[in-house]
Each structure stands twice: as C-alpha cells, then as structure tokens.
Curated annotation (Swiss-Prot):
Keywords: DNA-binding, Metal-binding, Nucleus, Repeat, Zinc, Zinc-finger. This is Protein TIS11. It comes from Drosophila melanogaster. It is found in: Nucleus. The keyword Zinc applies. The gene is Tis11.
Length: 436
C-alpha cells in the first residue's frame, strides 16, 4: 500500500469516493449539501489524514512486505472439530497421570535403595554381574578391623582377619625396581598400590614374602616326592617279607631230607638288603640314613627275628643227635639271610655280625639304581664252613647295610632293633658253646 492518499472521483450520480489504505470513507454530495456544515466535513477529513500518516510511520518502522501472505481456508465439519478438541483434552489429562506414575516409581526406587543401605547383610549379586575373583579376600576389611563388625558378614569381599587373607598372584618383577616418579618428583599417585619400590622397607617386605613363598613351595614339593617314593617302597618291602617267610617255612620243614641237603651244599643265597634306592630328592638329602625309616610299614620292623633264632637252635640240636645228616634252615629278617649246616651253631652268630670274622655284607642287589647322592654301600661276602664229615658243608651269608657315608660309620648310633638282635645272638651263642 502506498503512503499517499489516492483520491478518485467519479461523476456518477454526483458521488465522490475517497480511498486511504484500509480506511475508506464514502461521502455523498448531492444537492442537499447546504444542510450540512462544511467545517465538520473538513475536520473529519483532517482526522483521517492524520490517522493515515500515523499508519504510514508504523509501516516504515516494521519490515516492509511487498505482498501479503497467501492463506487458504478449508472448511471442516463441526463434528470433526469437536472430536479433535476432545482428544486434545484427553491427552492433556493423561500426561499428568503418567508423570505422577513416573514420580511414584522413582520414589519407590529411592526407598528400596535406602532400605538396602540400611540392611546389615547385602543381597546376592545378580548373575549378570560376575564377581572379580582376582582381588577377592586379598585385603583386610576396614570396618571389621576398626569396629570388629561388618554389615556384609560372610558375603564381604574383604578378609575378616589374617586367616582369611589370600596371596595375590603378582608379576615376578613386582617390587623389584625403584619407582622413577617417586624418586624423581617425591610423590607417586599410585601410593602403596604402586608396582615399584618406594623405600627400603617395601623392598625388604617383598623379599621376605618371596622367601616365605619359595620355602612353602619347596616343602610342598618335598612332601609330594616323599609320598611318591614311599608308596613303591612299602609295596616292595611287603612282597619281600612274604617271600622270605615262605622260604623260611619251606627250608625249616625239610631239615631231615637228603635231597635238600645236597642241593644246598656249597650254595650261596643272595637276598636283597632293602628296597631299591630311588633317585635322590629333597627328602633323601635331609635324612642321613637314606631310604631307611622307622615307620611301622617299613620292611625293617616287619620280619620275625625270634623265629629265625628258634630255627637255628633246633638245627644245632639236630646236629648233636645225628652227625651224618645235614639240614639247612634259612631265615630272612631286615634283609638278613643265612643258611646253616649240621654242627655249625657258631655260624649263626657270625652271620649276624657277632662272630670272629666281623661284619660282612652280600653283593649289591641288581635292582639298586645308582644315585648321585647315595652311592651303593660296600658289601663283603664271607663264607665260612667246617665239616663234621664229608657230606657236611656249611655256607652262610651275612647281610648288613653300611651307613650312608664312611665318616658316619662310627658316629651314627645303632638302631634298637640291632641291639635286641645282638643280645639274642649272644644268648644263643652261649647255649651253643655249652652244648658243644
């Protein structure tokens, strides 16, 4: 719209049109114009002009638009308009209800959280959150150490005392090098959890922990090796004891037979002294006697010594009554085997190490492996026999294991078993001397 007043006059029925912007004024002038006052008309025209000037100023201040916006109106039925209004009102009513529900659920959730914090025992973790087992029970529980109680109880992931504290699997180089940050700046952000050494106390503590760990590992290894070595030895000793008992019974029962005498004359019996020595382990180095032990299942204490002495005594009495017949009795105990002929009562004492010829040992068993720590003990074979005739030939064999080292042969005390044997042999020797 232009700012000027457009005045159009059209002579038609003596009428004039005045157009000004959006405001129009129709003035009719006819022959009865004399009835109206001209001054009032002029005043109205001036007011209209002033109003138009104000409108022009307002249009100049606002952004100028050359064309007005094109708008189209589409008529809709009144029912659709009412339905839309009702739906809009329902949505507005539902929105506050949903908001109130959300606030209620949030409040309930906060209440549950507060209840969980107030409980003395925590609930079990859901299966979706796995527990970190690498740090489980590796640190002491501070509330338990300070107050003596913990609200989590047995489900606490920290140790309630030193007995529950577990060792952490550290890197081999843990706490073996100095912390560059601590020694250059004087501060380390990791603090006591740093993997490097901050002072000498930490290094000493780490060395002590490593030494204790290595000692426990060595002890466990030695126990395992000793248990492994003990199982085959016990089995072999039981087999040897059963074999020796059967041989002693068979030889003692056939004392009066001539065939057994001829077969046993001039023969030597080699019986194994002890179970084969295994390769040296930690347990072998610690014990001065090698594989010998005083356990009730070992072969050293499971042989009948008194039965052997009784068989020898009966054989000597048989020699007095019948000098032409010979009998052989063999008894094995603690790896000791002996064969006796007629009239050789003194041979028993010599065979047990108490005779005139001194101690003697049989040759080495072929089952004994060579050990780098315990070398095979020396063995000597002494065969002594005196004939009461051409058919009486006595052969004996003394089995005795030497001490693990030559230097300990004189210092090591004798076992109680040998003391009992020596006392029994002395009594038997005195009886045989009196009988002869």
């Amino acid at each position: 719209m232009s700012a000027d007043i457009l005045q159009k006059s059209r002579e038609q029925d003596d009428s004039h049109y005045f157009e000004r912007g959006d405001i129009s004024k129709y003035v009719t002038m006819n022959d009865h114009l004399g009835d109206f006052d001209c001054n009032e008309v002029r005043k109205e025209i001036r007011m209209l002009l002033a109003h138009g000037a104000n409108l022009d100023q307002q249009h100049q201040q606002q952004p100028h638009r050359h064309h007005g916006g094109l708008t189209r109106t589409i008529s809709q039925p009144a029912q659709l308009i009412q339905q839309q209004q009702q739906q809009h009102q329902q949505q507005q009513q539902q929105q506050p209800a949903v908001a109130s529900l959300v606030t209620i659920t949030e409040n309930l959730g906060n209440m549950n959280l507060h209840r969980k914090l107030e409980r003395t025992q925590s609930e079990p973790l859901p299966p979706q959150q796995p527990m970190n087992t690498s740090r489980y029970k590796t640190e002491l529980c501070r509330p338990f150490e300070e107050a003596g109680e913990c609200k989590y109880g047995e489900k606490c992931q920290f140790a309630h005392g030193s007995h529950e504290l577990r060792n952490v699997h550290r890197h081999p180089k843990y706490k073996t090098e100095y912390c560059r940050t601590f020694h250059s700046v004087g501060f380390c952000p990791y603090g006591p959890r740093c993997h490097f050494v901050h002072n000498a106390d930490e290094a000493r503590a780490q060395q002590a922990a490593q030494a204790a760990k290595s000692s426990t590992q060595s002890q466990s290894q030695s126990q395992q090796s000793s248990s492994q070595n003990f199982s085959p030895k016990s089995n072999q000793s039981s087999n040897q004891s059963s074999n020796s008992s059967s041989s002693s019974s068979s030889s003692g029962g056939g004392g009066g037979g001539g065939n057994s005498i001829n077969n046993n004359n001039g023969s030597q019996f080699y019986l194994p002294l002890s179970p084969p020595l295994s390769m040296s382990t930690g347990s072998d180095r610690e014990s001065p006697t090698g594989s010998l032990s005083l356990s009730p299942t070992n072969s050293l204490t499971s042989f009948p010594f008194h039965d052997a002495l009784q068989h020898g005594y009966l054989a000597s009495n048989g020699a007095k009554s019948n000098s032409s017949a010979s009998s052989t009795s063999s008894a094995s105990g603690m790896g000791l085997g002996m064969s006796m002929g007629i009239g050789q009562g003194m041979i028993i004492g010599q065979g047990l190490g108490m005779g005139h010829h001194g101690p003697a040992t049989p040759p080495e068993s072929p089952n004994v492996p060579i050990s780098p720590v315990h070398t095979p003990p020396p063995y000597d074979v002494v065969v002594s026999g005196s004939g009461a005739g051409n058919n009486s030939v006595g052969s004996k064999q003394l089995l005795q294991k030497s001490v693990s080292t030559p230097m300990q042969q004189e210092d090591t005390p004798r076992l109680p078993v040998f003391n009992r044997l020596s006392s029994g042999v002395e009594a038997y020797q005195q009886q045989s001397n009196l009988g002869l």
